[in-house]
Amino acid sequence: MSLALAHKRRILAEGVAADAATVPAYNPSEALNSPANAQKHLALMLTALDGDLERISAINSREERQRLKRDELLPKYLDYVQRYRAAGLVYPNPVLVQVLVWLFDTVQFEAGLELALFAIGDGQEMPERFKRRDVQTFVADEVIDWAEAEYKAGRAPEPYVSNLLPLVDGQWQLFERIPARYHKLLGQLAMDNEEWAQAIEHLDRAVELYPEIGVGTRRAAAAKALAKAEAAKQSDE
């Protein structure tokens, strides 16, 4: 190599190094400081998320999948979600919605509901692979599915069912069978506690919402027990 060519290459290398030194280091805290930067950062996060979803799909054990979501992936992505919320920007954010799904998958209902309410206000939608595209329906279904399974297993599903009821049978517009399932379960819980009037109230509301909910036998038993309790009370007086 000639001395002239070697000198030219050295000058070019020094120029590249100088240019690189002027580029600021990547700072996650500044990645959401503008809409353009936010979209670039979202693309990076989605690439990482796709890889992590493939990792989950490759695991056969449900317990191991839950551990991965709870112990590794949620801490990894929650920081980004918190920064997105703090930035005040509004755009479709599949990463936020996936974090929401994982919170409910891992039965972190308090954090999940808090994020769900934000997502609803933000206009976020569920991923295309979900038949239920609105967040409200996803949350209501997830909680009642879990609660019914817990009750069947002899464990207490409260206070989650009661806490969500004002939204499920009130603020949120849902297919009527969903709030009817909440009232059906709450009616059964009230019967277990011999709170007959409250049980009848829930069971009647379940039928009002969705006549095919199937609580006729329970409703008759609660009414019979209530009449018996009232008769006993009157005789004591």
Where are the model-predicted features located?
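Residue signature of alpha-solenoid helical repeat architecture, marking inter-repeat boundaries
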Residues: 89-90, 134, 175-178, 210, ...
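TPR repeat positional signature
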Residues: 95-96, 100, 135-143, 183, ...
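Residue-level recognition of tetratricopeptide repeat
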Residues: 100-101, 148, 188, 221
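Residue at a conserved register position within TPR or TPR-like alpha-solenoid repeats
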Residues: 102-103, 183, 190, 223
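N-terminal alpha-helical interaction modules that lie
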Residues: 1-90, 117-173, 228, 232-237
